[in-house]
C-alpha cells in the first residue's frame, strides 16, 4: 500500500484564480484540491490536510452576503495562507480591522519586506514586484500577528502569526506578474506546512493502478474511447491496471473530424493491442439530433445515447461492471460547485442518465489537462495523440450551431482540416491550446465570379490556455489568416465568408456551444 500523500486545500471564495493556485501547488509536486468555503471543518481534520490556502474573491468582506468560512478552521492547527480576500477575511474573523480604501490598488507594486529571512519570504530579498487587485485593505492586524511586508499604498501587504502558522498576503502570488510568487507559495508548502513534494507523475500512476485494481477486482471494464487525449490515456492506464479485463468501445457517432475514426482504430488495435470494438452509430446519433437546435439539449442527447449504446454493447459482451471516462478537473469545476454557477453541462459529467447501469472509473477526475498529457507520455502514448488539441465529447455536434445535418458536418470537416493543416505548416500547433472551426446557423450574401451567393460563414477559433479555465485568443499572423480564408472559400463548397473569433475566456467560453 502506498504512503498517504500530502494534501493542500484551496478554499474557493469565488476568485478567478482559484484553479491557478491549485496548479501552482501541483507544479511544486504537492497534491492540491479546490474545496468550497462551505465544506465542514471536520472534513479537513478527517482528510489529514497539511495546509490550507484561502483564495481571493470578488466580494467585500464587509458585505452582509460575503462568503464566510467557519472560524473553527483557525483552531485546527493546520497552517493557513490567505490571499487577497482570503487575507482580509482571516484578519476580520480573528479580530483585526478591514476598511474600504480611498482608492483601489491594481497592477504591479513594490513589496518591501520587514523580515526578509522569515520562512514565508525567504529568498525574496528586501524588495519584490507583486501583483495587486484590491479595494479593501487590512488596517489593523489581529492579536498575535505582525506586519511582514508593505507597499506604498498598502500598509499591511503581508501579515503572519508564527505561533498559529496563520499568514496572509494582499497580493496574488499565483499569477506570473508577481515576480517571486512561486517562491512564496513554495515557502508556504515546504517551510510552513512541511510538505514532502511527493506528487509526481510516477506516484500518480502507481497510486491509480492500485486504486483501479482494488475498485475493479475481477470485474470487467468498458472504456469510452474517443481518440482524444483524456480517453486515450485513460484507456492505456486502465489497461496497465487490469489488462484483458478491459474492452474499449470506439463509437463513431458521425460527429468526428476528417479521418479520425480510421486513425483511432489503427492506433489502438495495432499499437496498443487493446481489445477494441468499433461501432458505427452515426445514423443513430444523427436521427436523434434531427430538428434539435438547443445546445444543452444536444449535449444531453449525445451523452444519453453514448450510455445507451454502451449498455447495448455490454449485453453483447456479457457481464460488464465498470465504465471508464476521461473526465478531467476543469470538467468537474465548470459543471458546478457551491461557489460557481453551472456554465454548461459537460459531456463527461452532467449528461449522464440517472439510471446508468455502470459504476464509473474516472482516473483523471482530479487532474488538469497538462497533467494528463504527462501521464500519457510516461505511459508511452504516442505524441500524435498526447499532443492533440482537446476535442469536446459531443464532437462536431457542438461546433455545428443549430440543427446538425450531414451537409453541415461535411462543410465543417473540410474547413477544419484546412485550418489545422495550415496551423501545423506554420509551426503553431503546439503553441495553441485549441484551433478549430465553427459553423454558425446563418448564411450571408457573397459574390463568387459574377454570381451572387448565399452561403455559410465559417468561424476560426484559436486560443492559448494552461488548463481551459481561462483562455486568450491567439494573434494569428495576417498573412496566415488570409491564406486560410482563401483556401476555405475556394476549396469548401457552400462557404463564402471566413471570420476570426477574437474573444477570450472570460467573457466567452472556448467552445461556442
UniProtKB/Swiss-Prot annotation:
CDD domains linked to this entry: GATase1_GMP_Synthase, GMP_synthase_C
Pfam families xrefs: GATase (PF00117), GMP_synt_C (PF00958), tRNA_Me_trans (PF03054)
Entry keyword set: ATP-binding, Glutamine amidotransferase, GMP biosynthesis, Ligase, Nucleotide-binding, Purine biosynthesis
Entry GO MF terms: ATP binding; GMP synthase activity
Annotated catalysed reactions: XMP + L-glutamine + ATP + H2O = GMP + L-glutamate + AMP + diphosphate + 2 H(+)
E.C. number(s) listed in UniProt: 6.3.5.2
EC category: ligase
InterPro entries for the chain: Class_I_gatase-like, GATASE, GMP_synth_C, GMP_synth_GATase, GMP_synthase, GMPS_ATP_PPase_dom, Rossmann-like_a/b/a_fold
Pathway: Purine metabolism; GMP biosynthesis; GMP from XMP (L-Gln route): step 1/1
Gene3D superfamilies documented for this protein: 3.30.300.10, 3.40.50.880, HUPs
Residues that hold ATP according to the record: 226-232
Coiled coil: none
Domain GMPS ATP-PPase: 199-388
Catalytic residue positions: 84, 172, 174
GO CC terms: cytosol
Glutamine amidotransferase type-1 domain: residues covered: 7-198
Transmembrane stretches, start-end: none
SUBUNIT field: Homodimer.
Primary role: Catalyzes the synthesis of GMP from XMP.
Name of the featured protein: GMP synthase [glutamine-hydrolyzing]
Organism: Symbiobacterium thermophilum (strain DSM 24528 / JCM 14929 / IAM 14863 / T)
Gene that this sequence comes from: guaA
Amino acid at each position: 500500500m502506498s504512503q498517504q500523500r500530502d494534501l493542500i486545500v484551496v478554499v474557493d471564495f469565488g476568485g478567478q484564480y482559484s484553479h491557478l493556485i491549485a496548479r501552482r501547488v501541483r507544479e511544486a509536486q504537492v497534491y492540491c484540491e479546490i474545496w468550497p468555503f462551505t465544506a465542514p471543518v471536520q472534513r479537513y481534520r478527517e482528510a489529514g490536510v497539511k495546509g490550507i490556502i484561502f483564495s481571493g474573491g470578488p466580494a467585500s468582506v464587509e458585505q452582509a452576503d460575503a462568503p464566510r468560512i467557519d472560524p473553527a478552521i483557525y483552531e485546527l492547527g493546520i497552517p493557513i495562507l490567505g490571499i487577497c480576500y482570503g487575507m482580509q477575511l482571516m484578519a476580520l474573523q480573528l479580530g483585526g480591522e478591514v476598511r474600504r480604501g480611498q482608492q483601489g490598488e491594481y497592477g504591479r507594486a513594490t513589496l518591501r519586506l520587514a523580515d526578509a529571512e522569515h520562512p514565508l519570504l525567504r529568498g525574496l530579498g528586501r524588495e519584490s514586484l507583486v501583483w495587486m487587485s484590491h479595494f479593501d485593505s487590512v488596517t489593523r492586524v489581529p492579536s498575535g500577528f505582525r506586519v511582514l511586508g508593505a507597499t506604498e499604498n498598502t500598509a499591511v501587504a503581508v501579515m503572519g502569526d508564527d505561533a498559529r502558522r496563520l499568514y496572509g498576503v494582499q497580493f496574488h502570488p499565483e499569477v506570473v506578474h508577481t515576480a517571486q510568487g512561486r517562491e512564496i507559495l513554495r515557502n508556504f508548502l515546504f517551510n510552513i506546512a512541511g510538505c514532502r513534494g511527493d506528487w509526481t507523475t510516477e506516484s500518480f500512476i502507481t497510486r491509480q493502478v492500485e486504486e483501479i485494481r482494488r475498485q475493479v477486482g475481477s470485474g470487467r471494464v468498458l472504456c469510452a474511447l474517443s481518440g482524444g487525449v483524456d480517453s486515450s490515456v485513460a484507456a492505456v492506464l486502465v489497461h496497465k491496471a487490469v489488462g484483458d479485463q478491459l474492452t474499449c468501445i470506439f463509437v463513431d457517432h458521425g460527429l468526428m473530424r476528417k479521418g479520425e475514426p480510421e486513425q483511432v482504430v489503427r492506433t489502438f488495435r495495432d499499437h496498443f493491442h487493446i481489445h477494441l470494438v468499433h461501432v458505427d452509430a452515426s445514423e443513430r446519433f444523427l436521427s436523434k439530433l434531427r430538428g434539435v437546435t438547443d445546445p444543452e439539449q444536444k449535449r444531453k442527447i449525445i451523452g444519453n445515447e453514448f450510455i445507451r449504446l454502451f449498455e447495448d454493447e455490454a449485453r453483447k459482451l456479457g457481464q460488464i461492471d465498470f465504465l471508464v471516462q476521461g473526465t478531467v478537473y476543469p470538467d468537474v469545476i465548470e459543471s458546478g460547485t457551491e461557489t460557481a454557477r453551472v456554465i454548461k453541462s459537460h459531456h463527461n459529467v452532467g449528461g449522464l442518465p440517472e439510471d446508468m447501469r455502470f459504476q464509473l472509473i474516472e482516473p483523471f477526475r482530479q487532474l488538469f489537462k497538462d497533467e494528463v498529457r504527462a501521464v500519457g507520455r510516461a505511459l508511452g502514448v504516442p505524441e500524435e495523440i498526447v499532443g492533440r488539441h482537446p476535442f469536446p465529447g459531443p464532437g462536431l455536434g457542438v461546433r455545428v450551431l443549430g440543427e446538425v445535418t450531414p451537409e453541415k458536418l461535411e462543410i465543417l470537416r473540410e474547413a477544419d482540416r484546412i485550418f489545422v493543416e495550415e496551423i501545423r505548416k506554420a509551426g503553431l500547433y503546439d503553441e495553441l491550446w485549441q484551433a478549430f472551426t465553427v459553423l454558425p446557423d446563418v448564411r450571408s450574401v457573397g459574390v463568387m465570379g459574377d454570381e451572387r451567393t448565399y452561403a455559410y460563414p465559417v468561424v476560426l477559433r484559436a486560443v492559448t490556455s494552461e488548463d481551459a479555465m481561462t483562455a486568450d485568443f491567439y494573434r494569428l499572423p495576417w498573412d496566415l489568416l488570409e491564406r486560410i480564408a482563401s483556401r476555405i472559400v475556394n476549396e469548401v463548397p457552400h462557404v463564402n465568408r471566413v471570420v476570426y473569433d477574437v474573444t477570450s475566456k472570460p467573457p466567452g467560453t472556448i467552445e461556442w456551444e
